From Swiss-Prot:
Function: Has a role in meiosis.
Coiled-coil segments on the chain, per record: none
A single GO BP: meiotic cell cycle
Keyword Nucleus: yes
Protein's cellular compartments: Cytoplasm; Nucleus
Name of the gene this protein is made from: mug94
GO cellular component: cytoplasm; cytosol; nucleus
Keywords tagged on the record: Cytoplasm, Meiosis, Nucleus
Protein name: Meiotically up-regulated gene 94 protein
Transferase is among the record's keywords: no
Lineage of source species: Eukaryota, Fungi, Dikarya, Ascomycota, Taphrinomycotina
Length: 188
């Protein structure tokens, strides 16, 4: 596994192969769009790619996802080894009882738990990240608070993702919809 390879011409294809590899291990009852959403968030956040994917034994999904999260925690929270260890323990416990998906420990939909963990330094959060996409009208959008982590893997415009104050409507943020890829402003 090589999580550090950056700038490869075939990185998009390799991420696609990574997604297909993990998707093949998801339980059949998980909806296809939810699988894709989870995996797109995961791959884009980490930029993780596999070399020698043919050597990965089937049914290693739990180890693969745990390794990806471990890499994420180490890169985004290097000063807190204890939190990384705590998160790995949480993953190990939840993966065994939740079809390979991290336990949410809150009211988040499972397809949003990945970004939730990132926004809360590797710990499940209580804050909902749902907003409604104005184009496809689905509540599956995620606040772009970690732009630097996945900008290189998607063609997002280089815009300021800090809160935007607009009159008495309160702080507003740029969001992206991971199903139709639209980017828009919405209240937190």
């Amino acid at each position: 596994m090589d999580f550090n390879k950056i700038g490869d011409e075939n990185v998009v294809f390799q991420i696609f192969k990574l997604e297909m590899l993990i998707m093949s291990e998801f339980p059949s009852f998980i909806e296809e769009k939810d699988k894709l959403l989870c995996l797109n968030v995961l791959a884009n956040l980490l930029g993780g790619i596999f070399e020698n994917e043919d050597k990965i034994i089937p049914n290693y999904k739990e180890a693969v996802i745990a390794a990806l999260f471990e890499r994420l925690l180490l890169s985004s929270n290097q000063k807190s080894t204890s939190k990384s260890n705590q998160m790995i323990k949480l993953l190990n416990n939840s993966l065994a009882h939740n079809n390979g998906l991290p336990s949410q420990r809150c009211n988040h939909d499972s397809k949003l738990v990945y970004m939730s963990l990132v926004q809360n330094n590797g710990l499940p959060g209580q804050r909902s990240n749902y907003v409604c996409c104005p184009l496809c009208m689905e509540q599956h959008c995620i606040e772009l608070l970690t732009y630097q982590l996945f900008a290189k893997w998607r063609n997002f415009p280089r815009i300021d993702f800090s809160p935007v104050l607009q009159g008495n409507r309160g702080p507003r943020f740029f969001y992206t919809c991971f199903l139709c890829n639209s980017t828009f402003l919405a209240s937190a």
